[in-house]
Amino acid sequence: MDTAFPVCGIVAEYNPFHSGHRFHIERTREMLGEHTIIVCAMSGNFVQRGAPAIIDKYARTKMALEGGADLVLELPVPFATAAAPIFAEAGVSLLTRLGCVDALCFGS
């Protein structure tokens, strides 16, 4: 699917969303263009290894949107609570199956 602007996917937990996450989104736009659409695949109320998130998914979504994301999608619980390889694979799969994501950007 062609879009007028590039679409970049980010797989994250944002537990909680902080200035480093904001920097990651800003830097992604610097690299891909200021009109890049940022779509995040984020864990819900439970994160990797089944731990409860320290802030609920709605508040974390709001923080991500206020921090520069354009769309936040919830990674289903069985994948969000899995080990890192499964978490990552599911996040990438969710984003690529949207059919509009042009790039993925990861931080560390």
Where are these regions (language model features)?
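Nucleotidyltransferase catalytic core that binds NTPs
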Residues: M1-S108
